[in-house]
């Protein structure tokens, strides 16, 4: 009888202890939350690195060099994709016609800028907003890199999703610029291609300072240590993980603050704006910058435009394997 009583008391005591631990953890977390963001610039608490079920990171062991590209024979060629299935940035200009390389207006600022880059630096640029141009892996394997620049929402159909995945797995290159982060929200594999990152919100468009964090990629190797630029400064959830951060924004230089329209407090001292990674067999170079059409001007009227364009050019060239990509520090 006494044995059963002692057992019952032990069970009650253990249950009570478990409850106390749980309550302590709960209230501890409740107290920790505000403290995490109490000081300006603390940044959002990161919630871990998502798992996309692929080889990803900064090691070239995640790259598939399967001989799908012959630049010595075929030269270098990229495909610029700017389809929008939602909000359209002004720098894209009017929607393009069907097919490959449709007519461009002067107000198709991004498309004209990338075509000019190619012409000046020895690689061919095709452009399209026609999803059927991405309908098979064979179409994409003509290109050393595919560029998504300010695409939006569900810009790919099922066939194009499959083709892009097979292209990357076969050693293809990808460059995602600005609202590439506002694209294919419901496709986890694509989020991984972006570095395990996605657009959440942004604060006011304003001037800030970009800080180069690594020169081990062609995109940042020749840039000044700091340079002024005006942008929206995307806040990200999730934030990039298992990537090499190439550049950040110094949040202390943002006079109007970094808090976004949905309350994101920013990323503190490590607010990434450009990074690179190997992903599922391919190369991916990413930047959240490039909102303002002025960033693509060449007349010196937009501070930081020259540095931004140099970074994008280097990112494209590294993604397509022409220049050093995402090397170890």
Segments the model singles out, each with a brief description of its role:
Residues 148, 152-225:
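A glycine-rich, often tryptophan-bearing local segment used as a flexible ligand/cofactor-contacting loop or short
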């Amino acid at each position: 009888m006494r044995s059963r009583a002692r057992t019952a008391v032990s069970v009650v005591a253990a249950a009570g202890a478990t409850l106390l631990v749980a309550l302590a953890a709960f209230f501890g977390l409740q107290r920790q939350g505000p403290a995490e963001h109490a000081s300006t610039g603390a940044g959002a608490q990161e919630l871990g690195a998502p798992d996309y079920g692929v080889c990803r990171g900064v090691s070239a062991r995640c790259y598939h060099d399967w001989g799908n590209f012959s630049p010595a024979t075929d030269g270098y060629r990229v495909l610029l994709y700017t389809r929008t299935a939602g909000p359209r940035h002004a720098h894209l200009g009017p929607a393009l016609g069907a097919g490959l390389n449709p007519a461009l207006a002067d107000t198709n600022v991004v498309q004209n800028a990338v075509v000019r880059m190619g012409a000046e630096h020895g690689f061919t640029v095709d452009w399209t907003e026609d999803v059927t141009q991405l309908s098979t892996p064979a179409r994409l394997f003509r290109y050393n890199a595919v560029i998504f620049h300010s695409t939006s929402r569900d810009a790919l159909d099922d066939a194009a999703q499959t083709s892009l995945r097979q292209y990357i797995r076969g050693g293809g290159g990808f460059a995602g610029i600005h609202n590439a982060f506002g694209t294919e929200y419901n496709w986890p594999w694509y989020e991984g291609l972006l570095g395990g990152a996605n657009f959440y919100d942004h604060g006011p468009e304003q001037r800030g300072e970009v800080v180069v964090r690594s020169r081990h990629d062609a995109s940042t190797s020749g840039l000044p240590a700091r340079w002024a630029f005006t942008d929206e400064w995307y806040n990200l959830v999730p934030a990039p993980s298992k990537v090499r951060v190439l550049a950040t924004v110094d949040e202390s230089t943002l006079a109007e603050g970094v808090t976004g329209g949905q309350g994101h407090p920013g990323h503190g001292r490590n607010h990434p704006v450009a990074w690179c990674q190997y992903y599922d067999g391919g190369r991916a170079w990413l930047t959240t910058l490039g909102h303002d059409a002025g960033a693509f001007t060449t007349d010196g009227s937009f501070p930081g435009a020259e540095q931004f364009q140099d970074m994008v050019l280097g990112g494209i060239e590294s993604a397509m394997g022409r220049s050093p990509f995402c090397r170890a520090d």
